[in-house]
Amino acid sequence: MKVIASSLRKGNVVDIDGRLYVVLTAQNFHPGKGTPVTQVDMRRISDGTKVSERWKTTEQVERATVDEREYDFLYEDGEGYHFMEPVSYDQVVVSPDVVGDGKVFLTEGMRVYLQTHNDVAISIEFPQKVTVEITETEPVVKGQTASSSYKPAMCTNGLRVMVPPHISAGTRIVINTEDLSYVERAKD
């Protein structure tokens, strides 16, 4: 489906010369004199190469038809990461390069959004927040309670996050998956 370049947003998938690209950033520039343009940074899905394109804001760009659905994570093996669609029970294998650094968040039964094109997974969206357990943390240094100080902690999935002083080993916490920041103590 053709769309004007100025309508492209982060996460959109475009088809340029038969290759799929996922939009990383899209900015519209309106100079005082001259034609407004849209600057788009993209990543080629096939090999991960980053590309930067500039179009006139009114130019037509081919937007790929992408199917986005919820999937449940099942397990990981030599083939890749296995997900199941909860309604039809269809299973799909996702390659490690699509999952990327988010693999540390995957737990059995976790619900994620997968974007597929021609039944091939092209991107994955993790939940905004996940609950993890702290395995080890440094002891509290006396006198650090006046300001909002944080201390490093190691989680069960191997992540290193900064947590408030009152968090100790064995505590379950909620972290933000985008910036790995502490959100709150888990309520379970």
Swiss-Prot record:
The protein's name in its UniProt record: Elongation factor P
Annotated GO CC locations: cytoplasm
Keyword annotations: Cytoplasm, Elongation factor, Protein biosynthesis
A molecular-function term among this protein's GO annotations: translation elongation factor activity
GO biological process, one term: peptide biosynthetic process
Compartments reported by the entry: Cytoplasm
Pathway: Protein biosynthesis; polypeptide chain elongation
Family: Belongs to the elongation factor P family.
Function field: Involved in peptide bond synthesis. Stimulates efficient translation and peptide-bond synthesis on native or reconstituted 70S ribosomes in vitro. Probably functions indirectly by altering the affinity of the ribosome for aminoacyl-tRNA, thus increasing their reactivity as acceptors for peptidyl transferase.
